[in-house]
Amino acid sequence: MLACIACSSKEGGEDGSRGAATPHGRDAVKSLTSQLKDMVLKFSGSNKHQHYKAATAGSPSFRSRSYRRPYPGFIDDSAFMTTTRPGGEAYMYTRAAPPPPVRAASTSMATWDMTRSKSNRGWQQDAGRSPGGTTWIQSIEEEAGADDVTVVEDAVPREWTAQVEPGVQITFVTLPGGGNDLKRIRFSRERFGEDRAKVWWEHNRDRIQAQYL
């Protein structure tokens, strides 16, 4: 191509101003100039492309396997820590357990003072004084047995006391549904010892229940 350019220049010199002045000569010069520009552009573009390939040949491509993004639905939470309270205890969200059912109040022999002990078959002495100054023996609780009575309290029960015999005082509870129940039996310490109080209750239990309950 450069030889052609030299030949054209030589021929142009021999022809003199005649060839340059003709329209055909001007077109040839324009065509030659355009070809030179195209060659320069192609050559510079080729060099840039080769330089880019050489620069990126040693680096991994963003399209390669090592640069593939993970699946959007995958979340790696291994780097996250559990949120903790100031004291260091981790927050835990659990369903609260339902509260235990409320059992109906039971007024039975287990609540009577004149009962038998679970750990000691004897009688306890829990001395107390009545308003009149008489000292009474308060017995201990007995194991709940067949005489248990379950009462559903729909109103506040009313208590009242009866002197069934000299030295024997019984506190009753009026049940909301009607009738009475025993709450406490007290024996005068001056008249009853522990053994005698126990014998008295065993002999008079049925009579007291039939009369007052």
From Swiss-Prot:
PROSITE patterns: BRX. Residues 7-27 are annotated as: Disordered. Keywords: Nucleus. Pfam families: BRX, BRX_N. It is found in: Nucleus. Its main location: nucleus. InterPro entries: Brevis_radix_dom, BRX-like, BRX_N. Residues 158-213 form the BRX domain. Disulfide bonds: none annotated. One of its GO terms (cellular component) is nucleus. PANTHER family: BRX DOMAIN-CONTAINING PROTEIN (PTHR46058:SF11), PROTEIN BREVIS RADIX-LIKE 1 (PTHR46058). Belongs to the BRX family. This is Putative protein Brevis radix-like 3. It comes from Oryza sativa subsp. japonica (Rice).
